[in-house]
Amino acid sequence: MVIGLVIFVSVAATIVGVLSNVLDMIMYVEENNEEDAKIKEEQELLLLY
């Protein structure tokens, strides 16, 4: 009973950790994409002048 509970808690903690890592990666990638888009726009504006 106790061992099963410990295993369940550890598995749940592992799943939560993996999900938080995945969310962090998604947020990081989206931020980088926005920065890349801004840089491209700035480069295009500089080329126009």
From Swiss-Prot:
Segments on the Virion surface side according to the record's topology features: 1
Job description of the protein: May play a role in cell adhesion and is important for virus virulence in vivo, although it is not required for the virus life cycle in cell cultures.
Subcellular compartments: Virion membrane; Host membrane
Protein family according to the UniProt entry: Belongs to the orthopoxvirus OPG059 family.
Transmembrane is among the record's keywords: yes
Keyword Isomerase in annotation: no
Main subcellular location: virion
Membrane topology: Single-pass type II membrane protein
Gene expressing this chain: OPG059
Intravirion compartment spans: 23-49
Keywords: Host membrane, Late protein, Membrane, Signal-anchor, Transmembrane, Transmembrane helix, Virion
Native organism: Monkeypox virus
N-terminal signal peptide: none
Protein name (record): Protein OPG059
One GO location term (cellular component): host cell membrane
Highest taxon in the source lineage: Viruses
Membrane-spanning parts: 2-22
